[in-house]
């Protein structure tokens, strides 16, 4: 399994629409950087957020998630409360090849501010916007800048094609758009 370089990422984005919209340059002046890098792609966070709240005294249950757990927010800067959590989505829409797995890691700019980003792997055959989990581990409110970089995606190409892709198994988050809350298939 090999880590893919910028030339491969560019080709897959431009010829196979693996990343849309695709930013061929790495933009970093005056913003949290985003776009193509040497061995990855820095994704941007959109303007929509779901911020966790305790206003309704609910319990977070991944098997029975309720909308009352979150407050919707849209804007250029999202303030994540101290020791709190928010969901967001990428601006980019991904179409993963059947022999490629992507791993996403948080950006050091945010990590050095106590903001941890978690994104689960993009499985072979997955298609959709990526839901981003943002955790503010500090005792202070933290700013997240929409339309700027939030994490870096690394693409790993398998030595052979898997038997069953995410699309084949009709994954529960396949073709998701916007921020997708937890789902349990019944």
UniProtKB/Swiss-Prot annotation:
Reaction catalysis annotation: dCTP + H2O + H(+) = dUTP + NH4(+)
Keyword Nucleotide-binding appears in the UniProt entry: yes
EC number annotated for this UniProt entry: 3.5.4.13
One Pfam family, short name: DCD
Protein keywords: Hydrolase, Nucleotide metabolism, Nucleotide-binding
Active site per UniProt: 133
Function: Catalyzes the deamination of dCTP to dUTP.
Description of how the protein assembles with itself and partners: Homotrimer.
Family: Belongs to the dCTP deaminase family.
Protein name: dCTP deaminase
């Amino acid at each position: 399994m090999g880590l893919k370089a910028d030339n491969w990422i560019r080709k897959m984005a431009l010829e196979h629409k693996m990343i849309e919209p695709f930013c061929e340059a790495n933009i970093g002046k005056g913003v949290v950087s985003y776009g193509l890098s040497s061995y990855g792609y820095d994704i941007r966070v959109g303007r929509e957020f779901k911020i966790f709240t305790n206003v309704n005294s609910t319990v977070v249950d991944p098997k029975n998630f309720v909308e009352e757990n979150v407050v919707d927010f849209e804007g250029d800067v999202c303030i994540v409360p101290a020791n709190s959590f928010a969901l967001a989505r990428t601006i980019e829409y991904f179409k993963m090849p059947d022999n490629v797995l992507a791993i996403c890691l948080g950006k050091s700019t945010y990590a050095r501010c106590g903001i941890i980003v978690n994104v689960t792997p993009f499985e072979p055959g997955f298609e959709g916007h990526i839901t981003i989990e943002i955790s503010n581990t500090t005792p202070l409110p933290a700013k997240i800048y929409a339309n700027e970089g939030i994490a870096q995606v690394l693409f790993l190409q398998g030595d052979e094609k898997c038997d069953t892709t995410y699309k084949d198994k009709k994954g529960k988050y396949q073709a998701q758009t916007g921020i997708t809350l937890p789902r349990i298939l019944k």
